């Protein structure tokens, strides 16, 4: 699960642009798909990090490439494989060596927190009353260990079922999976159900493989908020009143700048942040063997996903950030976000491999096209009377304009490669790829990526035969160029923003 850290260091930037690309069975996939898949379905994983190895992937490979090959269905009788993995997730707070309530108050006294010089009578009086209030809580046995309040220990389970069969000419495989993952933060979870169907058709001249999958992921954030909030809490702070009800406001612990609210009170309200994602993937690959040494390969990949997210703030929540005299008819809010993502990927490649005497030549080339489109719309509704009625139809108003966004990218690339060896001792590798992308600036629409390498298999020399304890000794060197687009798709394209709040005789205002 640490591929994103081990291949290249993580970035603190949003969406982690330092992630490598993941290629599964020759098609690009997401890191989430890799995390969710059954490890028993993986035949091999190859991590490409140096420029010479990644140059053929062009403008996407600057952070490395993770190539994954899955296990193909086996011919013969129908086989059913079931796998279940259970894990226990528990928080580890051993690294937090915190003071208890009495120690914290004694440390404040020792630091002179309540003995500031030069203050007038009223400031001194406030400090004394604050100290007396904290001391009263300590003497009454208040010693709240806030770090443990939002946490829990969970048993998670992951199930996978695989059915395979067929004959030498036609094989098929059906995979089903369910992943239940509850977080250590109370109320958080991520559940995923997916299914896939693969077929392999093979003759002496043609090889066809197709894989289609569909997955549904449901997730929910913890109503207890961020764990970092609880690290700021003070142990002598009460979180319940004498009747056992949650306190809305705390006395001394400040979580937000505007008000020291109680996060445990917020957890008892109707706040929620949840979402669902549906993903459909279709991958088709066709190999045509014109000759044993010459073949053509075509690939087509289609991915379509839809997502919906709902974030609701209870009208009783402190997060409404109301001040005295504010209009309370607009308390409570619901933010709905809908996303739609479509990706088309096509590739056509030819390859020729020939051995002539002591010479072995492998050459190939091809082209690749890819287009993606993402649509997002977001709307916020305000003015709810109760958390029990959080549907948009119960909202009082929609104070902000809905936000609609569409982002589309296109990529076209051509590539060529050469692998040559003489007597399997002297090795030569070279590759070239030229990418054209809508994300590049208009002054330079195309970018070249090349690599070259030399190698020497010393263990293949005749004089090495007497050193039977050496079975592999190789010297190699390589050079390559990589690159990556790290800015927004339209950052290199002049765009106009229309301001419908400013109207002139000629129409609405716009800015470049």
Segments and roles (model prediction):
Residues 1-3, 35-40, 57-62, 188-190, ...:
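Short, glycine-/polar-rich solvent-exposed loops and beta-turns at beta-strand/coil boundaries
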Residues 1, 13-16, 20, 64, ...:
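Residues embedded in well-ordered regular secondary structure
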Residues 95-128, 215-256, 311-313, 373-380, ...:
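A surface-exposed, glycine/aromatic-enriched loop/edge motif typical of exported proteins
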Residues 20, 25-51:
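Short acidic/polar hinge/loop motifs at secondary-structure boundaries
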Residues 7-11, 26, 49, 70-72, ...:
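Flexible glycine-/small-residue-rich
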Residues 147-222, 229-241, 277-283:
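Transmembrane beta-barrel wall of Gram-negative outer-membrane proteins
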Residues 1-25, 44, 54-74:
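Extracytoplasmic beta-strand/coil segments of soluble accessory domains associated
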């Amino acid at each position: 699960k640490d591929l994103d850290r081990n291949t290249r260091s993580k970035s603190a930037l949003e969406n982690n642009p330092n992630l490598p690309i993941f290629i599964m069975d020759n098609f690009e996939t997401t890191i989430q798909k890799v995390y969710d898949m059954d490890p028993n379905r993986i035949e091999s994983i190859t991590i490409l990090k140096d420029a010479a190895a990644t140059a053929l992937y062009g403008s996407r490979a600057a952070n490395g490439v993770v190539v994954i090959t899955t296990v193909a269905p086996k011919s013969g009788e129908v086989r059913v494989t079931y796998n279940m993995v259970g894990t226990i997730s528990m928080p580890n707070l051993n690294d937090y060596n915190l003071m208890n309530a009495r120690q914290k108050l004694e440390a404040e006294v020792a630091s002179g927190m309540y003995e500031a010089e030069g203050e007038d009578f009223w400031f001194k009086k406030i400090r004394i009353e604050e100290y007396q209030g904290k001391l009263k809580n300590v003497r009454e046995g208040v010693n709240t260990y806030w770090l443990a309040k939002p946490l829990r220990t969970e048993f998670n389970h992951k199930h996978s079922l695989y059915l395979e069969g067929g004959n030498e000419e036609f094989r098929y495989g059906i995979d089903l999976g369910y992943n239940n993952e509850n977080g250590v933060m109370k109320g958080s979870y991520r559940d995923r159900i997916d299914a896939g169907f693969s077929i392999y058709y093979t003759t002496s001249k043609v090889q066809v493989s197709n894989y289609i999958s569909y997955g549904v992921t449901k997730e929910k954030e913890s109503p207890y908020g961020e764990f970092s909030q609880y690290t700021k809490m003070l142990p002598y702070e009460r979180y319940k009143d004498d009747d056992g009800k949650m306190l809305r406001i705390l006395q001394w612990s400040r979580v937000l700048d505007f008000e020291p609210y109680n996060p445990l009170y917020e957890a008892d309200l109707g706040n929620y942040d949840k979402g669902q994602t549906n993903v459909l993937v279709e991958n088709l690959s066709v190999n045509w063997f014109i000759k044993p040494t010459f073949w053509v390969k075509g690939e087509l990949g289609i991915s379509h996903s839809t997502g919906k997210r709902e974030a609701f703030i209870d009208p009783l929540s402190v997060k409404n950030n109301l001040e005295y005299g504010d209009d309370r008819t607009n308390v409570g809010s619901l933010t709905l976000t809908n996303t739609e993502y479509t990706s088309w990927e096509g590739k056509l490649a030819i390859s020729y491999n020939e051995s002539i005497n002591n010479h072995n030549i492998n050459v190939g080339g091809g082209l690749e096209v890819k287009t993606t489109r993402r649509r997002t719309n977001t709307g916020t509704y305000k003015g709810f009377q109760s958390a029990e009625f959080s549907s948009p139809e119960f909202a009082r108003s929609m104070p902000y304009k809905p936000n609609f966004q569409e982002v589309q990218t296109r990529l076209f690339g051509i590539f060529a490669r050469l692998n040559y060896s003489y007597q399997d001792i002297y090795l030569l590798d070279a590759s070239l790829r030229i990418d054209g992308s809508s994300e590049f600036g208009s002054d330079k629409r195309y970018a070249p990526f090349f690599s070259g390498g030399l190698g020497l298999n010393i263990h293949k020399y005749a004089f090495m035969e007497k050193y039977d304890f050496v079975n592999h000794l190789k010297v190699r060197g390589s050079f390559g160029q990589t690159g990556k687009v790290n800015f927004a798709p339209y950052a290199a394209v002049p765009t106009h923003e229309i301001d419908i709040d400013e109207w002139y005789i000629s129409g609405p205002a716009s800015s470049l």
